[in-house]
Structure formats: structure tokens, C-alpha cells
Amino acid sequence: MSQPQDRDRRRLISASLAAGGLMAGGSMLSIEAGAAAKHKINMQLGWLIGGNQLGEVVAKKLGYFEQEDIDFQIQPGGPSIDGVAIVASGRFELGQVSSSPSLMLAVSQGLPIKCFAVGIQKHPYCFFSLKKNPIRNANDMVGKKIGIQSTGIILLRALLAKNKIAEKDVTIVVAGADMTPLMTGQVDAFTGWQTNTTALNVLGDQRVDMRLWDAGVKLYPLPYYATTETLAKKADQLAKFLRATGKGWEYAHANREKAVDLLVKEFPNLNRKDELDAAPVMLDYAFNANTKANGWGAMDPAVWKEQIDLYAELGQFSKRVPRVDEVMTLEILNATGAARPRIG
């Protein structure tokens, strides 16, 4: 499974946003009555397609979207594609980014988008070290060299701020995605997603993990978002999408090998063994105590408030600090509460 990179702060605002006409509609959930024709829903990603879309692919292959009268397609992202701007322009119906800060920053810049559910519950972004020189908590970072991608530096800064550690007490080494600097001792820790099991194999049983979430920086991974206009006028379609997708993730949880086979059949470029290794890790993030209580896709406004406050403290909002209700809504989750799987 590959690690998505959203370039949180780059090209959030495209000059061609075409968002001038996308005005927020009423706050009440609008449910359209039974249209016979299938609703076309394109989900724009911020990265190339992989195991992060296991549930969506299962839902498509098993006909769950068709049962909801949805013609569903996944639109891949990549380094030259600004998925947030594409969705904000109205070209596609919804999108998914790797991490919630992308949406917070976009809203602060005036893009009319809002999160309506999350794909997994806790962020798998992690600082990896080795047992011979372990980093098990934030304080262990003091005096250490941290290998990190340029897009992740803000996450390290957030972790340090949350734990009241001066940035000068840590050496930042900008690196790519390869774990070699950690294995050769050039750095003491290296960053990545725990779901990226293929890249982590090289660390073997010497691996020590410290999750960003456990260190106090609680960001939501794989948030689903749509424009405020879509939320106001096509809430029924988003609810159908969420019901079908939830069923797909539920099937994947109960039938992991079959789910991976469906994924690889849909996208033959993926490696079956790699996806089989990654699926259990991903599913452990998709379902936990919160989903058992509140259903797959659930999220907490208090977590959003905490991350907005932290990013404001770090000076990340160049225009204004967005309100929680501007960044996320529970309306689609509330409308699908009885249908979303409660597994944990």
C-alpha cells in the first residue's frame, strides 16, 4: 500500500477555482425523493489509487453502489493534480485527502468545501526508530536527527509544540520516502504511515513506532469532503455513497483476502502480497471502539477543534482561522447512522 502525499500547503488555491458561484446553501439536510436514474459520483483522490480505497473498490465490485442507484468512479490524484481545487470547482462530486489539515487550510483560504466523514479513525502517520536507539515518546526526540519528507515538517513542528519541545532541540533532515537513512544511521527516526507495510519491511523486528496521534497531535486521516453546495443540494446522494462505502468496508473487515482479490482485480498494477500485508493494518484503523459505538466513518467535532487550535498556534492560517462548523458537518453521518457498520 502506498503512502498518500497531499502537499497540504501547495496549490490549495488554484487561480481557476471557479468557486465564485459555489455559495453555501441552507444548513438543513436536503433529501431528494427517489430518482430513477443513477447518480454519477466521482471521488477525486489526492494520490494514486491503492489499498486506502479497499472499501470503495469492494462496494463497487459487489454492487453496493448500484443498489443505491450510484454510478461510482474513483479519480486518481498524483503530484500534478490538485484534488481539493478540482472538487471545489464543482468538476467532481466529492473527494478524499490524506489528512484533515488540507481541508482546514483550504477552508481558511475561502474554498467552499466541508468534511462529512472520515475513512479511518486515527492517523497512521508515525515516527519509526530502531530498538538499539528507540524513540518511544516525544521527549525521546530531544537531541535526535529526524528524517522527514518536506510535506511532513509541519507535523513534526505540531508534535514538538504539543509537547512543549523547542524546535532547536531536534535536527530535521529532509529526505525522501526510502528508509535507508534510518537503516544506515544517518537519522535516528524516519517518518511514514504504518499502513505502508511494504516500505516498512526493511526494518524487520527492530522497528519501534511512535504514532503522531499518541504523541498528542490528533489529525483525521482520509477525510471525505464535498462542496457546501453539494452538501446542501445533493445530501441524499452523499448519504447513499456513505451507506454503500460503509458496507464495502464491513465486507473487507470480514473477508480480507477476498476484498484484496477484488482490489487487485480492479487495479492489476497493485501487488497482491503487499496489499494482503497492508489490509489488516488499514482495517484496524478503520474500525475501533469509536466505530463500534458510532458507526464506520464517525468523527468528533472536539478533535477538529483541537487540531484547528493547534494549527492556529503554529501560524498556519495565513488569512483567518476557520470555525469547526465551517470545516466539518455531522449531517450526512446522522442521516446514515442506522446503516453504517458498528464494528470495533
Model regions and ranges:
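Conserved C-terminal helix/tail region of periplasmic/extracytoplasmic solute-binding proteins
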Residues: 304-344
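N-terminal export signals
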Residues: 11-32
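Secondary-structure end/capping motifs
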Residues: 232-316
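Secretory targeting signals
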Residues: 1-7
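Residues that mark the N-terminal boundary/hinge immediately upstream of a DNA-recognition element
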Residues: 8-9, 137
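Periplasmic-binding protein-like
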Residues: 119-129, 201-231, 242, 280-285
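Short, glycine-/small- and polar/acidic-enriched structural segments
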Residues: 36-184, 188-194, 205, 210-211, ...
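A residue-level marker of the well-folded mature domains of exported/periplasmic proteins
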Residues: 74, 171-172, 180-189, 200-209, ...
